[in-house]
Regions:
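Nucleotidyltransferase catalytic core that binds NTPs
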Residues: 1-135
Length: 135
């Protein structure tokens, strides 16, 4: 099955890698959709986010053995992209539910499934940035 996930992936950390490996293990290929720089700014993560530009974030993700395809999206959510590629499995981190995940209803309606992968490590890019800044 084709697996799809998305995120900002600004400063890749162990939690991201474990999550992506778990997502890939659910199927035969993993597509990772990455928020464009403008999309990240719309999310309200801070005026200086993303720390790493889109091309850098995509290159780092593409270098992971568990990732088969990396694509970017400009919208606030990847709903249109999810509907266009219609994966069999849509994956998000453990704090998401099908009700709060863009595109989940469409995937499920088409016979696919939504999977929330539990967080394996207590990691956060936002917390890491705050720590580096001494906050």
């Amino acid at each position: 099955p084709r697996v799809f996930t998305n995120g900002v992936f600004d400063i890749l950390h162990r939690g991201h890698v474990t999550y992506l490996e778990q997502a890939r293990a659910l199927g035969g290929s993993l597509t990772v959709a990455v928020n464009s720089d403008a999309s990240v700014r719309h999310l309200g993560k801070g005026d200086d986010r993303p720390m790493n530009p889109l091309d850098d974030r995509m290159a780092v993700l593409a270098a992971l053995a568990c990732v088969d395809l990396v694509v970017a999206f400009d919208d606030d959510t990847p709903r249109a992209l999810i509907v266009a590629c219609m994966p069999e499995i849509l994956v998000k981190g453990g704090d998401y539910t099908a009700a709060t995940t863009a595109g989940a209803a469409e995937v499920v309606a088409a016979g696919g499934r939504f999977v929330a992968v539990p967080f394996a490590h207590d990691r956060s890019t936002t917390a890491l940035i705050a720590k580096v800044r001494g906050r």
